[in-house]
């Protein structure tokens, strides 16, 4: 517990909040060759590796992920949501923030239905997250 004189001399320091998706908060200026702190909700990138990973205990599955080199030069690991995907190496994707709780080191999610990432086929409910168009009713 600080004394009154300690508080007068030094005061209280504000807590610094740490970003949960730090790669979205940086922009690379290629003309000046330096990084600026300009946050964005999405970032475009190119897949450098598409692979699978097993989750932490107690879950059991084979989760798909992609290693993505972003437009700001950073390389991140992003989760591929939904059943089945068409992503390969050199596919252009859009990523957003949002971690996968049971995959360590995965802080980003690929947006389905944009760029080279196709939407999930035959999806009726919750289509917005998976980039699926509304089915035609006959």
UniProtKB/Swiss-Prot annotation:
GO terms for molecular function: rRNA binding; structural constituent of ribosome; tRNA binding. It comes from the Bacteria. The modification 3-methylthioaspartic acid is found at residue 102. One of its GO terms (biological process) is translation. Keywords: Methylation, Ribonucleoprotein, Ribosomal protein, RNA-binding, rRNA-binding, tRNA-binding. Residues 1-20, 116-138 are annotated as: Disordered. Pfam families: Ribosom_S12_S23 (PF00164). PROSITE patterns: RIBOSOMAL_S12. GO terms for cellular component: small ribosomal subunit. InterPro entries: NA-bd_OB-fold, Ribosomal_uS12, Ribosomal_uS12_bac. With S4 and S5 plays an important role in translational accuracy. Interacts with and stabilizes bases of the 16S rRNA that are involved in tRNA selection in the A site and with the mRNA backbone. Located at the interface of the 30S and 50S subunits, it traverses the body of the 30S subunit contacting proteins on the other side and probably holding the rRNA structure together. The combined cluster of proteins S8, S12 and S17 appears to hold together the shoulder and platform of the 30S subunit. Belongs to the universal ribosomal protein uS12 family. Part of the 30S ribosomal subunit. Contacts proteins S8 and S17. May interact with IF1 in the 30S initiation complex. This is Small ribosomal subunit protein uS12. The lineage of its organism: Bacteria, Bacillati, Mycoplasmatota, Mycoplasmoidales, Metamycoplasmataceae. The gene is rpsL.
